[in-house]
């Protein structure tokens, strides 16, 4: 079976030659603004999988997000420095979701369709966001994208309705609830119920031990 063009693009992305090119690009990206509109996607295979099309109404934005723990405002009331909660604050969001929100604030008339990872250095992570203008005539006439005009899909990135938002909320079907707090709670609850049922029949099983088959 013949491999598609996108398969070769994926292989090129993982090659050592591309890593050298990416290193030079990261130097340029660090000097650029945190949210910058670009002409074409860097990873065409990932952009196509999200729904990108090279036509009017689509906008590609590269966003830079700082890595590591974040800082919070220092509280006025007194407490131990350990309990200040100022340094090393970890938000309950992924970097990709934060990048999508930054792009949506920069371009409030556009809706976020999806995003993907493009690179990282010692200080920042870089993502490319695929955005769509829901009021553009070309988008309105597209049967696969006109759902963005529905009022229920406005500001979808701020309500956790994108892929990155659903992943952080534990709602992706492919991911399920595994690894989330709700999954762990359900697992423990199931174990407690099974243990309770097992303990309830313990004395009955001991009394009828001689009557069990093979004993």
From Swiss-Prot:
Residues 188-202 have a biased composition (Basic and acidic residues). Belongs to the eukaryotic ribosomal protein eL15 family. Residues 179-215 are annotated as: Disordered. Keywords: Ribonucleoprotein, Ribosomal protein. It comes from the Archaea. This is Large ribosomal subunit protein eL15. One of its GO terms (biological process) is cytoplasmic translation. GO terms for cellular component: cytosolic large ribosomal subunit. GO terms for molecular function: RNA binding; structural constituent of ribosome. SMART domains: Ribosomal_L15e. InterPro entries: Rbsml_eL15_core_dom_sf (IPR024794), Ribosomal_eL15 (IPR000439), Ribosomal_eL15_arc (IPR020926), Ribosomal_eL15_CS (IPR020925), Ribosomal_uL23/eL15/eS24_sf (IPR012678). The gene is rpl15e. The keyword Ribosomal protein applies.
């Amino acid at each position: 079976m013949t491999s598609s063009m996108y398969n070769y693009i994926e292989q090129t992305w993982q090659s050592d030659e591309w890593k050298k090119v990416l290193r030079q690009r990261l130097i340029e990206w660090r000097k650029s603004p945190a949210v910058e509109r670009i002409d074409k996607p860097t990873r065409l295979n990932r952009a196509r999988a999200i729904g990108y099309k090279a036509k009017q109404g689509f906008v590609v934005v590269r966003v830079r997000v700082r890595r590591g723990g974040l800082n919070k405002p220092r509280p006025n009331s007194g407490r131990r420095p350990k309990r200040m909660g100022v340094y090393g604050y970890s938000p309950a969001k992924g970097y990709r979701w934060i990048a999508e929100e930054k792009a949506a604030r920069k371009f409030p008339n556009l809706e976020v369709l999806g995003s993907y990872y493009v690179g990282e250095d010692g200080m920042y992570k870089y993502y490319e966001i695929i955005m769509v203008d829901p009021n553009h005539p070309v988008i309105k006439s597209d049967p696969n994208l006109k759902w963005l005009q529905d009022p229920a899909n406005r500001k979808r990135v701020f309500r956790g309705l994108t892929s990155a938002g659903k992943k952080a909320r534990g709602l992706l079907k492919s991911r399920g609830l595994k690894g989330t707090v709700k999954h762990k709670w359900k697992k423990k609850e199931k174990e407690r119920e099974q243990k309770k049922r097992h303990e309830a029949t313990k004395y009955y099983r001991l009394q009828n031990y001689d009557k069990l088959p093979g004993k």
